[in-house]
Amino acid sequence: MGRLQLALNVEDIDEAVTFYSKLFSTEPAKRRPGYANFAVSEPPLKLVLIENRGQGGSINHLGVEVEDVDTVDATQSRLAEAGLASVDERGTTCCYAKQDKFWVQGAPNGEQWEVYTVLEDSMTFNAAGADDDPCCCGTDEAASVHGTVAACC
């Protein structure tokens, strides 16, 4: 696979960016209002910060960023063969990027895991274009799976 993604809810995006820039000795790869992501090389990590007041200090979701759509498909097939269900999202907009992804179902503690690849950059945070909405689940089916705003990207 590619690299692990950790998406955190933060109270103050500017304060969080300052802290994580120092922690990982790097600047954000992408910065938008209420949003930042870091492509950390060592350790290999995609760190996503989502300003979500009242939810700071909690995990938004976890993910694995992979190189291409073929890897998304192969991973989804492998997990299906292992008995894990998933919810497919193709061509969805999330975190200022158009993505092909799926959400893995059945984590024992309810964690939200996505496996995704970025197809292209986007000027909007999510599919609806509501940049102030910290949820970008993309489809009604995925939104019903993820439940609350804090539980999905």
Annotate the PLM regions.
Residues 16-18, 77-87:
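Short, positively charged
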Residues 2-46:
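Core segments of cupin and vicinal oxygen chelate
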Residues 46-50, 114:
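Conserved beta-strand in the GNAT
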Residues 25-30, 67, 91-94:
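Short linear motifs in intrinsically disordered
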Residues 50-53, 118-120:
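Acetyl-CoA-dependent GNAT
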Residues 3-11, 39, 54-153:
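Vicinal oxygen chelate
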